[in-house]
Amino acid sequence: MTNSQSDAALAAVLDRFDPSAGGPGAYDTPLGITNPPIDELLDRVSSKYALVIYAAKRARQINDYYNQLGEGILEYVGPLVEPGLQEKPLSIALREIHGDLLEHTEGE
């Protein structure tokens, strides 16, 4: 293999992992605290403290929903987005908030 061939092969491998070159990137985009971005979540509430309370309340509802499934009681609403495998209730709640799937009045 000549130098130019090895350089071309290396460039092809690098392009495969470069999202700006149309590749998927080295890693999938993680869900949860880093995705959706905090800045976009803060656009939906008045402060970071309101976001914490809002997300925590919804995560608690999702957790209670999963706990009640075995009892046959359907008092709580389940996730409004498709949960990922082993995805935590807080991550689900943040994705619901980001998707504007919930209505929230601050102070409640």
Swiss-Prot record:
EC number, UniProt record: 2.7.7.6
Catalytic activity: RNA(n) + a ribonucleoside 5'-triphosphate = RNA(n+1) + diphosphate
Enzyme class: transferase
GO cellular component term of the entry, any: DNA-directed RNA polymerase complex
Record's signal peptide: none
GO MF, one example: DNA binding
UniProt record, GO biological process: DNA-templated transcription
Keyword set, alphabetical order: DNA-directed RNA polymerase, Nucleotidyltransferase, Transcription, Transferase
Top-rank taxon: Bacteria
Key word Nucleotidyltransferase present: yes
Annotated family: Belongs to the RNA polymerase subunit omega family.
NCBIfam families: rpoZ
Self-association state and partner proteins as the record states: The RNAP catalytic core consists of 2 alpha, 1 beta, 1 beta' and 1 omega subunit. When a sigma factor is associated with the core the holoenzyme is formed, which can initiate transcription.
HAMAP family: RNApol_bact_RpoZ (MF_00366)
Function: Promotes RNA polymerase assembly. Latches the N- and C-terminal regions of the beta' subunit thereby facilitating its interaction with the beta and alpha subunits.
Name of protein: DNA-directed RNA polymerase subunit omega
Species of origin: Mycolicibacterium paratuberculosis (strain ATCC BAA-968 / K-10)
Origin organism lineage: Bacteria, Bacillati, Actinomycetota, Actinomycetes, Mycobacteriales
